[in-house]
């Protein structure tokens, strides 16, 4: 079991190398034969296919098999589907004598089944000649489904012929495609398309998700991803997950364990004081949403500070949340010296501070943010214009700050912080690199959102919904994060929990509404509902 509570409670997402290590541990140290693993994997995939598309009795299924163990999994799937009554046509993309040992064994089992007459004429096995011949062969079958078992996690270079043509061919079919482990042509670590890649409707992945299914082109190429239990012990997967490049992903179970509980004798100051600093004309709504999100996440006492020019707006919108006006200067931004004095008592008594929603980019405001970061010893969340104020100064501020901090950039903000070096071709590595460099928890928002800690611990958000593609959801996320930190969650767990709960709230909205109609304030109504339904019975684990 990994030392971090985030790692222990969130399941692993593995690289190809880590998955190979898990196979090796299971076979050599745990004593489970490779053939048994293949059988369990194929049987599990066949069951998932039946669950999604069945019953497949008398339906035609075309199984495309490569020469490696991915192809062997496909041969096991073919055997189980045909014995369950499907009409199965197996296409071998290589000569039988080129198959891996376990795949060759499974081909012999299929041929024996065919020879025994046990499945009648429902099983046919052929070698690929060309796609024109294949088209003619499968057209009379009217396939219900295609299974991609051509290439698995070992692929690192562009797909070559004849598999390249097969990928293009299967992508042109109208029936759905199920990929085994990863879609052929997808890099299992980066999600990059290696020349061509299968566009699957579903992917049955073995033992644990692969990183490439979650990043890059993975989500659009893999479709719905289901994890198939192949009999690997959990401790084997945890051990493999310690390999470089592996991450974890959020789950309801993890958030339930982290979710703050209240003692019967709790009072407002005992369950977290959060301070939100934000707002500037015309963005007064941003700190309002953040402050409300902090309260909806359970912080007992929330205060909101903003420029005096919008104080009346903040006070009118936040009838249950005290507001604090900050002096402004000649540039219409916050006056640094006077504002720091005005904020001192609130900052000293807060358990966590959020800086940035709607704050604006006036020079005085940016100077105020940088001085606040240098001086306060309260945990910080920096978002939006709070991040923009750090651009060009973040490396020195990382050394000068007094408290832990969470940075919540979207792609544009991240590039401004990281400069020309901040390429996002590999989102996970980028978040990890700069979290370590800035000694921060970096919540890099996007697809997927990545939470990386300064020691390398990394958690992906596991809920993605287009409902979140609307203005203001980042303000709500930042407010959730500071609210959870104020209640005692570690910065990494607070960021991961906020990400998961916000996604669950958007998902909940989309279950009863058109996701395109959601606005950020709808999340404020959904967060307490989702918390009660899915997380509220948990115990706090900081």
Swiss-Prot record:
Some GO term, biological process aspect, for this entry: which one?
metabolite repair
Cofactor binding summary note: Binds 1 potassium ion per subunit.
Q: Does the keyword Aminoacyl-tRNA synthetase apply?
A: no
Residues annotated as region ADP-dependent (S)-NAD(P)H-hydrate dehydratase? 251-542
* Region span, NAD(P)H-hydrate epimerase: 1-243
Residue limits of the YjeF C-terminal domain? 251-534
Q: Where is this region: NADPHX 2?
A: 410-416
Q: Which InterPro entries match?
A: CARKD, Nnr, Ribokinase-like, YjeF_N_dom, YjeF_N_dom_sf
Gene Ontology molecular function: ADP-dependent NAD(P)H-hydrate dehydratase activity; ATP binding; metal ion binding; NAD(P)HX epimerase activity
For the ligand ((6S)-NADPHX 2), the binding residues are 358, 475
Q: What is this protein called?
A: Bifunctional NAD(P)H-hydrate repair enzyme Nnr
Organism encoding this protein: Salinibacter ruber (strain DSM 13855 / M31)
In the UniProt record, the gene name given for this protein reads: nnr
């Amino acid at each position: 079991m990994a030392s971090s509570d985030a790692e222990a409670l969130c399941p692993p997402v593995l690289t190809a190398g880590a998955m190979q290590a898990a196979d090796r541990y299971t076979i050599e140290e745990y004593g489970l034969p490779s053939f048994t693993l293949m059988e369990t994997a194929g049987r599990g995939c066949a069951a998932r296919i039946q669950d999604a598309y069945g019953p497949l009795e008398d339906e035609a299924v075309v199984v495309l098999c490569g020469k490696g163990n991915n192809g062997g999994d496909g041969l096991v799937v073919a055997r189980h589907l045909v014995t369950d009554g499907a009409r199965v046509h197996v296409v071998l993309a290589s000569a039988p004598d080129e198959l891996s040992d376990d795949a060759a064994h499974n081909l012999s089992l299929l041929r024996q089944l065919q020879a025994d007459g046990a499945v009648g004429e429902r099983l046919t096995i052929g070698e690929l000649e060309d796609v024109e011949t294949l088209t003619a062969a499968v057209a009379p079958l009217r396939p219900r489904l295609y299974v991609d078992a051509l290439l698995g996690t070992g692929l690192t270079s562009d797909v070559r012929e004849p598999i390249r043509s097969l990928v293009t061919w299967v992508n042109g079919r109208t029936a759905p495609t199920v990929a085994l482990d990863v879609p052929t042509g997808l890099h299992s670590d980066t999600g990059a398309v290696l020349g061509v890649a299968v566009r699957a409707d579903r992917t049955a992945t073995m033992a644990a998700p692969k990183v490439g299914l979650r990043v890059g082109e993975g989500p659009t190429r893999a479709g719905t991803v289901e994890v198939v239990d192949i009999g690997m012990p959990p401790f084997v997967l945890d051990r493999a997950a310690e390999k470089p490049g592996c991450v974890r992903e959020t789950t309801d179970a993890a958030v339930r364990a982290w979710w703050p509980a209240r003692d019967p004798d709790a009072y407002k100051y005992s369950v977290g004081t959060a301070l939100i600093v934000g707002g500037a004309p015309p963005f007064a709504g941003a700190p309002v949403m953040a402050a409300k999100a902090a309260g909806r996440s359970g912080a007992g006492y929330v205060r909101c500070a903003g420029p005096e020019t919008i104080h009346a707006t903040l006070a009118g919108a936040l009838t249950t949340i005290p507001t604090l006006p900050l002096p402004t200067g000649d540039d219409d931004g916050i006056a640094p010296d006077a504002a720091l004095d005005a904020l001192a008592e609130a900052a000293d008594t807060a358990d966590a501070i959020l800086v940035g929603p709607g704050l604006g980019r006036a020079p005085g405001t940016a100077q105020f943010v940088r001085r606040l970061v240098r001086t306060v010893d309260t945990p910080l969340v920096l978002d939006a214009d709070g991040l923009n104020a750090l651009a060009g100064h973040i490396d020195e501020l990382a050394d000068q700050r007094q408290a832990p901090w969470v940075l919540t950039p979207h792609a544009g903000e991240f590039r401004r912080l990281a400069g020309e070096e901040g390429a996002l071709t590999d989102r996970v590595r980028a978040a990890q690199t700069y979290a370590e460099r800035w000694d921060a928890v970096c919540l890099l928002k996007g697809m997927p959102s990545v939470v990386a800690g300064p020691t390398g611990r990394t958690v992906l958000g596991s809920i993605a919904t287009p409902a979140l593609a609307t203005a203001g959801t980042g303000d709500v996320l930042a407010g959730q994060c500071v609210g959870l930190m104020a209640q005692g969650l570690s910065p990494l767990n607070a960021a991961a929990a906020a990400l998961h709960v916000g996604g669950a709230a958007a998902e909940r909205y989309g279950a009863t509404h058109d996701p395109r109609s959601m606005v950020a304030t709808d999340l404020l109504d959904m967060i307490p509902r989702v918390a009660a339904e899915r997380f509220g019975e948990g115990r706090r684990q900081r």
